[in-house]
């Protein structure tokens, strides 16, 4: 007889509309590859649900029976996810909750509660931490919210329930008391070196698709100064320091273990800020690099950093060490390629600084994955044009980059935009009508081209085909931008149909389908039936 599950950890994709999808549920891992056209950037993507897997590891280490159901990596529809949850033997369900997917997640919680009235519903993460009072007042279906670090909360909660102890002893927990008043317990932060390594239950699936496994080497951001970022508020509520580090030895030991277990040749250090402060943080980063070299670990390494940090490393000649250690790609939070917007974002750098960093990294053979906010409420079309130009300079492409939008958490709306109701789905999100039109037209192109990209066989796409598809996308942007700039009347429907026809013709030899028949209402695929 199977042992009863003590707790089920649940992840689910953000609302499909937020990712520019068409309300269909595609295989998540396959969809990512298509989005990047299987180029040199897609394998840096970390697809493991790291937070869920890390908490699962701590629970297992404390001898609890844990189930992880992740709607994203398992490509579950809302209905399929509910079906899986109702089949679980658990009475405790801990959900991830995002502002962008709140409605869907709450619906799922209600379905669980409807069929299992005695089930305990918990949630956590940055958004619930910052908005715990509002969420507990609004949703009776949620019983508890973890505040900040969740590593020990679920262990301590289960122990308290099993031992009939007061929940006031469980740190980092918000809940309603017997009178309905919201209580929050004492906050604590965990020592990262004391945590057991992340569970890797999805590792082989991720590796087989060509993606990188992820390793968290720190928590937080040493700077947390970007004006639109939630992190400072999150850390205030959860009483966390700006940044915490794992020791270099601890990090490299996990890397060695992953190499031994999975024979990997690439890894992503998926911190918010791998390098941290310019003194302590960079010393730790260099110590990690030196340990990797000392242990003769040869692999592609992907890290996340800031423009200001890269400037410091350039000035102190640290890039050669980083390259020698195996760093082949750096994700940099540029956020904008406009001086006025960089100032407004409080980035502490200029377009000239960005150019210096880009040139230095490229000279050292390190490619750049750009963190760039293509659209947000106050941008005009020239701001957007400059952002697109940076993508071009970097040689970067993914199908979503033309329609990236700043998702604004509730507590940032009033502070940053003086608009408490601002939402990415509202007609009034964009303050400039031309910017709104540009975004809408680019969204139409994206939604046309993504289903076509999904037809492409990964191993058969060539660099020439990629460059052709990149050029079509850039040309469409230029077409819309130039018409808007000249205040011309235009309709993209026919232009998009013509692009679609050209793309179908170009990719037909490398598609999974036997042929693509372009019809009035789209295309029909006649797939080969393989024995």
Predicted features along the sequence, with ranges:
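N-terminal [4Fe-4S]-dependent radical SAM core
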Residues: 19-21, 170, 176-218, 515
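A solvent-exposed, charged loop/short amphipathic helix patch at secondary-structure junctions
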Residues: 20-42
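Glycine-rich beta-alpha loop elements in corrinoid/cobalamin-binding modules
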Residues: 51, 55-186, 411
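Structural recognition of alpha->loop->beta junctions
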Residues: 134-152, 318-330, 386-404
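Radical SAM [4Fe-4S] cluster-binding motif and immediate context
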Residues: 193-368, 376, 389
């Amino acid at each position: 007889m199977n042992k009863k599950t003590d707790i089920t950890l649940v992840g689910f994709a953000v609302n499909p509309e937020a990712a520019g999808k068409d309300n269909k549920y595609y295989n998540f891992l396959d969809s990512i590859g298509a989005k990047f056209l299987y180029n040199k950037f897609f394998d840096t993507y970390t697809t493991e649900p790291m937070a869920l897997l890390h908490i699962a590891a701590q629970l297992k280490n404390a001898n609890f029976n844990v189930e992880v159901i992740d709607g994203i990596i398992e490509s579950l529809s809302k209905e399929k996810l509910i079906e899986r949850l109702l089949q679980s033997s658990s009475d405790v369900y801990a959900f991830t909750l995002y502002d962008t997917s709140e409605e869907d997640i709450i619906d799922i919680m209600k379905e669980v509660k409807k069929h299992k009235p005695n089930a305990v519903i918990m949630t956590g993460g940055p958004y619930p931490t910052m908005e715990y009072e509002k969420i507990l007042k609004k949703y009776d279906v949620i019983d508890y919210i973890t505040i900040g670090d969740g590593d020990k909360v679920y262990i301590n909660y289960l122990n308290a329930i099993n031992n009939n102890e007061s929940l006031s002893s469980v740190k980092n927990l918000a809940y309603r008391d017997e009178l309905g008043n919201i209580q929050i317990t004492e906050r604590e932060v965990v020592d990262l070196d004391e945590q057991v390594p992340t569970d890797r239950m999805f590792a082989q699936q991720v590796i087989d698709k060509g993606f990188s496994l992820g390793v968290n080497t720190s928590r937080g951001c040493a700077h947390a100064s970007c004006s639109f970022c939630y992190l400072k508020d999150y850390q205030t509520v959860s009483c966390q320091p700006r940044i915490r580090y794992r020791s270099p030895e601890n990090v490299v030991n996990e890397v060695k273990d992953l190499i031994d277990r999975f024979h990997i040749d690439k890894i992503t250090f998926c911190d918010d800020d791998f390098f941290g402060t310019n003194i302590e943080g960079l010393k730790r980063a260099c110590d990690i690099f030196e340990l990797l070299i000392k242990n003769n670990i040869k692999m592609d390494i992907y890290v996340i950093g800031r423009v200001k940090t890269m400037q410091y490393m350039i000035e102190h000649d640290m890039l050669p060490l980083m390259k020698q250690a195996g760093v082949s790609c750096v994700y940099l939070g540029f956020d904008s390629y406009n001086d006025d917007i960089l100032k407004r974002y409080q980035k502490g750098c200029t377009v000239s600084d960005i150019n210096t960093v880009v040139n230095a990294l490229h000279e050292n053979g390190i490619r750049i994955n750009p963190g760039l906010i293509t659209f947000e409420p106050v941008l005009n079309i020239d701001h957007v044009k400059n952002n697109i130009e940076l993508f071009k300079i970097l040689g970067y492409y993914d199908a979503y980059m033309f329609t990236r939008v700043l998702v604004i958490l509730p507590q940032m709306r009033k502070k940053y935009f003086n608009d408490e109701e601002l939402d990415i789905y509202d007609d009034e999100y964009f303050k400039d009508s031309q910017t709104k039109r540009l975004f809408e037209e680019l969204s139409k192109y994206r939604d046309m081209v993504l289903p076509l990209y999904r037809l492409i066989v990964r191993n058969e796409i060539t660099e020439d085909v990629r460059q052709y598809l990149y050029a079509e996308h850039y040309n469409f942007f230029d077409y819309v931008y130039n018409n808007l700039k000249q205040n011309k009347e235009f309709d993209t429907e026919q232009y998009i149909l013509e692009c679609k026809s050209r793309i179908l013709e170009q990719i037909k030899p490398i598609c999974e389908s036997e042929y693509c028949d372009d019809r009035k209402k789209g295309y029909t695929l006649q797939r080969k039936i393989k024995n």
